[in-house]
Amino acid sequence: MVGEDPYLISDLDRRGRRRSFAERYDPSLKTMIPMRPYARLAPNPVDDAGLLSFATFSWLTPVMIRSYKHTLTVDTLPPLSPYDSSDVNAKRLQILWDEEIERVGPERASLGRVVWKFQRTRVLMDVVANILCIIMAALGPTVLIHQILQHVTNISSGHIGISICLCLALFATEFTKVLFRALAWAINYRTAIRLKVALSTLIFKNLLSFKTLTHISAGEVLNVLSSDSYSLFEAALFCPLPATIPILMVVCAVYAFFILGSTALVGICVYLIFIPIQMFMAKLNSAFRRSAISVTDKRVQTMNEFLTCIKLIKMYAWEKSFMNTIHDIRKREKKLLEKAGYVQSGNSALAPIVSTIAIVSTFTCHIFLKRTLTAPVAFSVIAMFNVMKFSIAILPFSVKAVAEASVSLRRMKKILVAKSPPSYITQPEDPDTILLLANATLTWEQEINRKRGPSKTQDQRRHVFKKQRAELYSEQSLSDQGVASPERQSGSPKSVLHNISFVVRKGKVLGICGNVGSGKSSLISALLGQMQLQKGVVAASGPLAYVSQQAWIFHGNVRENILFGEKYNHQRYQHTVHVCGLQKDLNSLPYGDLTEIGERGVNLSGGQRQRISLARAVYANRQLYLLDDPLSAVDAHVGKHVFEECIKKTLKGKTVVLVTHQLQFLESCDEVILLEDGEICEKGTHKELMEERGRYAKLIHNLRGLQFKDPEHIYNVAMVETLKESQAQRDEDAVLASGDERDEGKEPETEEFVDIKAPVHQLIQIESPQEGIVTWKTYHTYIKASGGYLVSFLVLCLFFLMMGSSAFSTWWLGLWLDSGSQVICAPQSNETACNVNQTLQDTKHHMYQLVYIASMMSVLTFGIIKGFTFTNTTLMASSSLHNRVFNKIVSSPMSFFDTTPTGRLMNRFSKDMDELDVRLPFHAENFLQQFSMVVFILVIMAASFPVVLVVLAGLAILFFILLRIFHRGVQELKQVENISRSPWFSHITSSMQGLGVIHAYDKKDDCISKFKALNDENSSHLLYFNCALRWFALRMDILMNIVTFVVALLVTLSFSSISASSKGLSLSYIIQLSGLLQVCVRTGTETQAKFTSAELMREYISTCVPEHTQSFKVGTCPKDWPSRGEITFKDYRMRYRDNTPLVLDGLNLNIQSGQTVGIVGRTGSGKSSLGMALFRLVEPASGTIFIDEVDICTVGLEELRTKLTMIPQDPVLFVGTVRYNLDPLGSHTDEMLWHVLERTFMRDTIMKLPEKLQAEVTENGENFSVGERQLLCMARALLRNSKIILLDEATASMDSKTDTLVQSTIKEAFKSCTVLTIAHRLNTVLNCDLVLVMENGKVIEFDKPEVLAEKPDSAFAMLLAAEVGL
């Protein structure tokens, strides 16, 4: 049953020709061969399996034996079969989905219908196998047991041979049943895995088709691709099973009516009544799950945001606020999960309850009508109802699967019908033109009413293009462009860019500048096709490269981030590294360019991240370069080097669009655009704009005046000229040196780093298969979390009471029949009949009837109580584990987050929490019900027919050998599946964060290919795990079939001293046990596998080492500390993690109260590490920091961090409102908030928003520009009113004007504070009292800026000269 041949999938696109039957099912037909002696050595052994091997899972035996002898790893398991792969199945599902959309439209399209078409052939084959299984299952209990029990009553020797033949027939039917059931599951598992990989790939491809994600959150994406795809996997497994129930009902009803009479219909009716009840409960469960999932999405999204922004949260000591938020969401989620759990638990309890009610009702009615009842008839009916019970027992699985699948399909359809808007970017007609915008008005939102069709819109664009081309290519002044605001129709969204018109010819450099929020980044986004075009034309030619304002770095090494899928060329690569100023950085890294980078580049500085992003663009060697402020995060010297060597030289001949706040670079641009409020304010060459003396000229004069004409300092013209001359001399020396090298035939890049072999896992700690093995500590932790041992014991007792009541009712019936036979029994034509009429007349036997009915009521009562208590207990456990793990992670140091991928943590809080909340309780409940039933069956059989225990003991050795192999193998397979899931999660998260970059470089296919590879790897291990469960189940079934055969022989050949009811009871129970025991062991193993999630959570609880939240030493801290803000470093050394180099080495410096200190130095010199040290995000290796003469290591972390304020390099905004982002703790009034917004020049911007302070902030603050985000962060800092302020390049994303205003605000607002300013633009530190110059983690200069500037050979003077030289 292999399915579609991957090499024939392409034929599916040929809609005109249907493939022949042989073409479509060739691999499946080969599998139908009973045995295939000549193996083709396929990548996966299942593809070489014949029918017998496929049905019995024998192809898996080598893997199970290997798992027993050796530890399994991701690399040692065979890959997923090509027929089950993402690539093959996603293509096929995509075609079916496209056909559905084309046929009925997106609104009426049914994803469920498409899923049915995708797998209907395999489902029908599965149903056929299940029907054959059901026929065999019904044949044994209904016909053969009845015949055996009838022959048992006849002691004549002539019947012994017939009895033995009946026993052999019973063994044959049971064995055939087992074989067909195994075949059905073998088909089902491959069907389910194909559906899972196909749907998840289709979802990911659709999400990746968007250039920006605004319609779905990151949390929802993770939930859909993990939990929802698994829900569809389970649905494909269990949904076909109920199709056999009607056939079973008919067979059992007919035969029961035949042997018992019309009263048998009572029991059948009971089953039929409960089926619609289960359907109603399924709908109810679906509604509760739908509500719970929406809250789960919110929790996962908030958790993802928390983990992404953990550094800022720790610095601001906001952990408690976020913990309260997530705990509140979790409480809401738990309430909804409780309701779904009650319904689900009721569904699980229905099988034993319905069976007991049906049997008791049938026999009570039969006896009440004074009809004759014999032991063979009674126990044949019981055996038959037990077969029906197993069929009903699968309904909870199917009902749960349908309920969750319906929710999942609805969520998936919502994603699939959301189509990315058509590209509005056209090709310029002039081959010399690379970029052209003609009266382009763009918005971030889609228009509400699109009255024009696509063709009409395209025609209009062409018309506008032709009409305005002559005007654009002329030398006319464009001063009138972009002034008038476009008229918009009612219902159209607000435009962000208005009437933008400009042309960029091939090989030209266009500089774009403007204030914060003027639309610079939006213009880059417009050129990338990420916005919505309302009118006008946007045309671009040639492949492009894009450097985003906030660098996107993925988990891998430096080289992988630079190459980004391109082939490695040594010379080109070395040149790229040189021109991007990365040589020294790579030489300082432990493994050079093979050094592993954490997620989002956590172990790199902002400047290093930005230059790696730039190197990626340079190495790509594209025709068009869109650079969104790439030089703000680097110091002046590196900035000059990058601009000169990279942008002016390496990219010479390329077309470059450079957005920058560093106006000194604009002089070298061929053309400059000044944006204001989304419109072009001025446009022309630098010289032309300076001559016009407009806004641009004023900005440039302000910049120069700010840098060199400040009356407070001594920077005069002579000094500037001196600095220029010294810099020019250094540049000339460098040129001469490089010339000498060229004369000698050497490469100009002399500092070429050497390739070295790096270990695979340097930073990110990998999950090993040994981690997560379930130990007793896990069960202990779970039991304590659920309320303790007493609560767990009481819950366990409820299971035994419920199932004990069910088993008791059957035993009591046998006792009743024995009692009746003692009163009056007579042989009647080869059977013993009891005259129940006379039995009922005896008052003693009224008690039997009452107790029999009471047993039914007790099953019902205990079932209801069990459902409520078990649901509450398991949810208490999962919530307790969630909160404990979250609290542990929150209190972990930053080194933990540096070495633990966010994807792995999100795996814990999404998929693993789903396992603990929903799947573990479901499997555990079924296991406990089955286990308690097995115990009572064994007890009753031991009492009524002890010889059975001898048979079971004889096969116990084989059973334990099988269990030992199975248990080891299934545990390891589950571990490997868990481990392979984390990289998959990380790739999803990283891809969603880097959509813009992925599209710009046209790497969507590479990203999808990697997703498919990771998806296939995880799905392969999931398939192996599930197949291992069935491998064991089949072999257990065969062992129990042997036991059933032996017991049937013993019943046939046993002494007459054993009553007929005892024999009937034993035979009906051994048939029940033969199926129940393997189900019990398998469900127990699945439950233990689900406990792996609890083990992984426990590991975090036990291994996460908290930060030193309390002080190291005993010390007293004044109440108003710090009152002055004096900071002293004494021989301070710091490293980020053990066995890593020092990042701060022997710092000794004193900063007086109220001083402003500018911290400068090359990228990676240790500037940002100073902030980490002050906030104790990293504990010192040695040395001390004193604030107001108090050792900060003697102060609690929360107290320390609340007294300091940090404005980070990368602005961080949270999903919520503007007010929440400014004041998460809600401790300030609106007036105070408006006041700080006014001081940071954001009041007008917020006032324009409809809901003002309550205005929505989207994920990552995407509805604000980077500069606006930074200003909001500045406002947030002003509210804290701290004595010590650290600005980590806080104004890097601001234009010079806003920067100047903000600097004056900082000077005024923090005039009594100690302010440390880390900056790359030196104008931000020239007014500081002191300048601290750092290099390689050491202080190389610390003095007044004017003193350092007067020394031409000082490091600060060199940096200043580099900026002046620009």
UniProtKB/Swiss-Prot annotation:
Gene Ontology MF terms in the entry: ABC-type transporter activity; ATP binding; ATP hydrolysis activity; ATPase-coupled transmembrane transporter activity
Transmembrane feature ranges: 125-145, 160-180, 235-255, 257-277, 349-369, 377-397, 788-808, 850-870, 943-963, 1038-1058
Keywords: ATP-binding, Endoplasmic reticulum, Glycoprotein, Membrane, Nucleotide-binding, Repeat, Transmembrane, Transmembrane helix, Transport
Region described as Disordered: 472-494, 729-751
Bilayer topology: Multi-pass membrane protein
Biased composition (Basic and acidic residues): 729-748
Binding site for ATP 1: 514-521
GO biological process terms on file: transmembrane transport
Residue ranges occupied by any ABC transporter domain in the UniProt entry: 478-702, 1127-1361
Domain ABC transmembrane type-1 per the UniProt entry, residue ranges: 123-404, 792-1089
Tissue expression from the record: High expressed in testis.
Subcellular location(s) of the protein: Endoplasmic reticulum membrane
CDD domains reported for this sequence: ABC_6TM_MRP5_8_9_D1 (cd18592), ABC_6TM_MRP5_8_9_D2 (cd18599), ABCC_MRP_domain1 (cd03250), ABCC_MRP_domain2 (cd03244)
InterPro entries recorded: AAA+_ATPase (IPR003593), ABC1_TM_dom (IPR011527), ABC1_TM_sf (IPR036640), ABC_transporter-like_ATP-bd (IPR003439), ABC_transporter-like_CS (IPR017871), ABC_transporter_C-like (IPR050173), P-loop_NTPase (IPR027417)
GO terms under cellular component: endoplasmic reticulum; endoplasmic reticulum membrane; membrane; plasma membrane
Glycosylated residues in this chain: 439, 837, 978
Biased segments, Polar residues type: 474-493
Binding-site positions, ATP 2: 1161-1168
Pfam families: ABC_membrane, ABC_tran
Family: Belongs to the ABC transporter superfamily. ABCC family. Conjugate transporter (TC 3.A.1.208) subfamily.
Summary of the function given for this chain in its UniProt record: Probable transporter, its substrate specificity is unknown.
Official protein name in the record: ATP-binding cassette sub-family C member 12
Species of the source: Rattus norvegicus (Rat)
Encoding gene, per UniProt annotation: Abcc12
